[in-house]
Amino acid sequence: MGDNDQVTTEQRERSGRREQNKAENRAALLKAARTVFAEIGYGAAGVRDIVRRTDLASGTFYNYFKDKDEIFEAVVGELTGELLKRHNNGRAKATTAEAFFHAHYAVYFDFIVDDAELLALGQKNFTAIRTLLDKPDVRALALALNDDIRAAIAAGVLPNVDVSYLAAAMAGIAFEISIVMVARDPVDPAGAAEFATRLMMGGLDRLPRR
């Protein structure tokens, strides 16, 4: 191997280590932020609270995130990515309208309560989360729901109704019921999913067809 080849190899290795270090630092900050937001809430949390939960220098935060708002959005974005995966294995495979609605709500409500930290995050931050509903990561959930409804209509699983209205209704019901659900003790995701499903089924036959 010539000197130039060796230099190139060393440069690649250094670059690879730098990228890995960046990824690890970002992941550490996100993990710490999720914990802090769950414990004290978005309003009370500060950048210093987040950095203290890591081994990173205080200035490192700003290499990855502009401010508290941006890292909060990133935390919620990670969660929506996981929700999308679960919906792909839920409502997207439903063969009846009832199964479609139930899968949609069960995935959402179970996701919130399966993780104690995530449950606390939802309990303390629903107002802040509401402000992110138009952000790209969260909008991806709405787009996926619209796509799944269209596919279900095409497959005869759902009647041919207004897709946008139905998606908005489903998303709104999920979010608003989740706020009430997480405030209760004990939290009952199964009951919440059943209530939302029956509510949708009760109105489905009355919706105008297209």
What are these language model-derived features?
Residues 1-16, 110, 114, 143-154, ...:
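C-terminal peripheral helix-coil segments that are non-catalytic and often amphipathic
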Residues 119-123, 131, 161:
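Short, hydrophobic secondary-structure boundary micro-motifs
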